[in-house]
Amino acid sequence: MTNSKTIKTNRRLGRRLILVLALGVATVFMAAPASGLAASTFGAKLNKNIQPSNSTPAQPCTMPAKSCTRIEMDAYNNAGHERAPKDGVIKKVKLIAGGPGHFKLQIAEAKPGKDKGRVVRNGPRIDYNGQPNGNSLTYDVESFPVHVPVEKGQYLAISAKKTSMLRCSSGGPNQFLFTPALSPGGPFQTLSYTDGCWLLLEAVYQ
C-alpha cells in the first residue's frame, strides 16, 4: 500500500516538474523575439506622423550643388541608436522625404569627438518619391530592399548633391557633411561642416 502511494506521489511530482520545465522553455522562446527586435534596426525611428519639415526644396551640399557625404550622427526619434548595434546585413532601408530625389547609400565610421569620418562601403543607388501631398496630416514612409553588410558601431550615410530626406526643426551636429563625397576605403577625414537637420533614414537588419 505504501509503495502504491509512493508511486502515485512520484508520478504527480514528475508531471508537475515537466509542466514547470515546459513553462520555462516557453517563456524563453517568448522572450527571444523581443530581444531580437530590440536590435533589428538602427538610425532614425520612422513612422507616418514624422514630418519632413522645411526639407523642400531639396537642400544642396554646396552652391553650385556638388555631391557630398552626409553621416547620420543623431537618430531622429531614436536617440542613442545612431550606430549599428551588431554585425549583420541590412535588408531594407526606410526614409521620409519631402520631395523626389536619389542618393547612394553608404556605410560610414565616425569619431564624433574629433569631427572626423570615413566611408567603408557603398550600397545601391536609391530613388525616392517624397510626399504626394505636402498638406497631408500623415507622411509616406518609403521602403527599399537592399543587401548591405554592416559592422557593429558603424553609421548610416548617403552620397548626394541634394536631399529632402530631412527634418529641419532644431540645431546641433545632427549630420557630419563631407565635400566632396567620400569614397570607400579612404582614411578618416575632417568634416567640412555640420548640419542641424536630421537625416530621416532607418536601417532594418536581415
Predicted region positions:
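Short proline/glycine- and polar residue-rich coil/turn motifs
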Residues: 126-138
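Beta-sandwich interaction modules
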Residues: 135-149
